Each structure stands twice: as structure tokens, then as C-alpha cells.
């Protein structure tokens, strides 16, 4: 009887410890959300990650917590022009890859696979944990059987952001010369080929793009426009974050239905559920106190797994360029954005500061002006 009592006591204590751990994690997540990613985040993150998982790469260049400089002047200036002598730091790139692998594996996390889900399965949305979705037959049919990046490795990769800083850059030819080209949010390329190139190996598509760029497919004209854009991908990977928020459910299903109905030649991928938090965790441990990683930062983090050298274009979260000329938020539309707004889910200038630091150390190359040979 005494042995049985001790067993019950041990089980109760174990449950209590587990409860306290999860309560602590929830409190930290709430604190991060309420503070906008500043102040006490570093100590909070250190309590969640063991010493062996802490990154050693110097990204912010100091031991003090990273805070957004609201003037942005200290962040955006002194980027070397494309013609400056930038040298790839292979040792640092490999170290970053190994550290990121402690948090995620892009080969696996780039997409949920068909063998892990079946039609009717219930999934909790990442940002709306109280809301759920059922895996539809269309979604199931489009899940890849194996990772689209299984055993893939590329010499050079271009990640093309959508900033208006690309306009008049003449970077199109340079971008297309890379082994693997990643683009964001179905950004148009044909009309801007001189500056952004045409080659696409992977393109992301946030569900909100369907609303913003294709008028929620309200009629046949808009459906045809989206269909033409999808057909132009011609075998590329279409990366659709389907499990983020419930607001995107219908839009994801519309796209899935179009792809199946019209036999569009794309390789669909739907990122794993842990991916976003894993990416965020990596950057937080490097004192880059982001709220929610942007698509560009997500793509860079994933690309470290399968790219030897990474080149970034169109990453510029400021309304003026280095010469104080106006810069559009997107190179292809007139959308406005408050880069430093507390209401924004992203901290773009802070992300840029981290990428700029990695550029200076040779881990990646950041191009924010004209490319070599541009006329």
C-alpha cells in the first residue's frame, strides 16, 4: 500500500511539473506578444532553450538586446553597393546551417507529406488555436508524397523580396543566373523582368494574396488571371501556408480546386505546423526579437539548408532609399505599409538589421541598389 501511495505521489508531482512548464511557456509567449518583442524576451527565450541550443553567430554585434531604431538611420545606411568586394564566408554559412538544424529541418518542414494526414483530419490553426479546419480531399490530393527538396543542394540561391527598391536595379539577369530562385507571394515578373528576372523555382502564396491581387476571384476574369499566373510557374514549387489562420481557409481551397481542375503544372507544398515557431525560436535565441517572421526571413532560414551561397534582392523595409529617393512598398503595386507600426505583425527594420549584419560577415549577400552590369 505504501509503495502504491508513493507511485501516486510521484505521478502527481510529474503532472504538476509539466503543468508549470507549459504555464511558463504560455506566460512567455504572452509577454512577447504584449511587448512587441523587446525588453525581457532574451531571458524568456533562454529559459526555454538549453545552453546547447543557443546560437553562437554574432548577428546584432553586441550582447545587448536588439531594439528597433525607430529612425531607421543606423540600420539602413552603409550597405555596400553591388560592385563592392563581398566575399562569401563558407565557415560561417555552415555554422548557421548547423545551428538552424537544431530548430528545424527545411527538407522536412517545407511541407506536410501525404502519409501524415488523411481527408477529414482536424488541424488547429497556428494563429487561431481555438479554430480548426478539416483536411479536404483537394488538399490531401495535392500534398506531396516526398519533400520537394529531398536531397537537393544548390550552389547559389536568390531570394527575391518585393520591395520597390528593385525598380531600375537591372538585377533580372543576375537573379536568373542563380541555381535556384525563390520568390514571394506570387509577385508578377513578366512586366518587370529587367529588374526582377523571370526564373522561378519556388514561390510562396499567402492566402491574403488572393484577396489583394486577385479580388477574391469574384468573377471569371479574376479566376483566369490567377490561372494564367499559376500556369506560368511551369513546374515550380508553390508554397502555400494553409494552416496559419482560419481567414485563409476558403482562399486556399479555391486555389487547390483551380490547380486540380485545370491540371496546373506546379508542385504544391504546405509548410509544417511547427515551422513558424521554430524559425522564430532560432532568431530569438540570436537576439533578433521579431514578432512574426516575414516571408522573406522564413525563406532565408529555410534556404540555409540547401543553398551554399544565398543572395537577397528586394529586401528594403524603408520608404526612402540610401539617396533619399522614395521607395514603393511593393515594386508592382501602390500598397502602403507602416514599417515601424506597433500594429504590424512583423518587425521588418529589425529583420533587415540582422540580415545586414550577416551580409557584412559574408554569410549572405544583400543587394539593395543596382546590380553589376545594369544600365
Swiss-Prot record:
Q: Does the keyword Electron transport apply?
A: no
Q: In which pathway does it act?
A: Protein modification; protein glycosylation
* Source organism superkingdom: Eukaryota
Outline which residue ranges sit on the Cytoplasmic face.
1-6
Membrane topology (Lumenal): 24-375
Where is CMP-N-acetyl-beta-neuraminate bound in this sequence? 162, 185, 294-296, 316, 329-330
Cellular component annotations (GO), alphabetically ordered: extracellular region; Golgi apparatus; Golgi membrane; plasma membrane
Q: Which residues form the active site?
A: 346
Question: Which family does the entry's similarity section mention?
Answer: Belongs to the glycosyltransferase 29 family.
Q: What name is this protein filed under?
A: Alpha-2,8-sialyltransferase 8B
Amino acid at each position: 500500500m505504501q509503495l502504491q501511495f508513493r507511485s501516486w505521489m510521484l505521478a502527481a508531482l510529474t503532472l504538476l511539473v509539466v503543468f508549470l512548464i507549459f504555464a511558463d511557456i504560455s506566460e512567455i509567449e504572452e509577454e512577447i506578444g504584449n511587448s512587441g518583442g523587446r525588453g525581457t524576451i532574451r531571458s524568456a527565450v533562454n529559459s526555454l532553450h538549453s545552453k546547447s541550443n543557443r546560437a553562437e553567430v554574432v548577428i546584432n554585434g553586441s550582447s545587448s538586446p536588439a531594439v528597433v531604431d525607430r529612425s531607421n538611420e543606423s540600420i539602413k545606411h552603409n550597405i555596400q553597393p553591388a560592385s563592392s568586394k563581398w566575399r562569401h564566408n563558407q565557415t560561417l554559412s555552415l555554422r548557421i546551417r548547423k545551428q538552424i538544424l537544431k530548430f528545424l529541418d527545411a527538407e522536412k518542414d517545407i511541407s506536410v507529406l501525404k502519409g501524415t494526414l488523411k481527408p477529414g483530419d482536424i488541424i488547429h490553426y497556428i494563429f487561431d488555436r481555438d479554430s480548426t479546419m478539416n483536411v479536404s480531399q483537394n488538399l490531401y490530393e495535392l500534398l506531396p508524397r516526398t519533400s520537394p527538396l529531398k536531397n537537393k543542394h544548390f550552389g547559389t540561391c536568390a531570394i527575391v523580396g518585393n520591395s520597390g527598391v528593385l525598380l531600375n536595379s537591372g538585377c533580372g539577369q543576375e537573379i536568373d543566373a542563380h541555381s535556384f530562385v525563390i520568390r514571394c507571394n506570387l509577385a508578377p515578373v513578366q512586366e518587370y523582368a529587367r529588374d526582377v528576372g523571370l526564373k522561378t523555382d519556388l514561390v510562396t502564396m499567402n492566402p491574403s494574396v488572393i484577396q489583394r491581387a486577385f479580388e477574391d476571384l469574384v468573377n471569371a476574369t479574376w479566376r483566369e488571371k490567377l490561372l494564367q499566373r499559376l500556369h506560368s510557374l511551369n513546374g515550380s514549387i508553390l508554397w502555400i501556408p494553409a494552416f496559419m489562420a482560419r481567414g485563409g481557409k476558403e482562399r486556399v481551397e479555391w486555389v487547390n480546386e483551380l490547380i486540380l481542375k485545370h491540371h496546373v503544372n506546379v508542385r504544391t507544398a504546405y509548410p509544417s505546423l511547427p515551422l513558424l515557431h521554430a524559425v522564430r525560436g532560432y532568431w530569438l535565441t540570436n537576439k533578433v526579437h521579431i514578432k512574426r517572421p516575414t516571408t522573406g526571413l522564413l525563406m532565408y532560414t529555410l534556404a540555409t539548408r540547401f543553398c551554399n551561397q544565398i543572395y537577397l534582392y528586394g529586401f528594403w523595409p524603408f520608404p526612402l532609399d540610401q539617396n533619399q529617393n522614395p521607395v514603393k512598398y511593393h515594386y508592382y503595386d501602390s500598397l502602403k505599409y507602416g514599417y515601424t507600426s506597433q500594429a504590424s505583425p512583423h518587425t521588418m527594420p529589425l529583420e533587415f538589421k540582422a540580415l545586414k549584419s550577416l551580409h557584412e560577415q559574408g554569410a549572405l549577400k544583400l543587394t539593395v541598389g543596382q546590380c553589376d552590369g545594369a544600365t
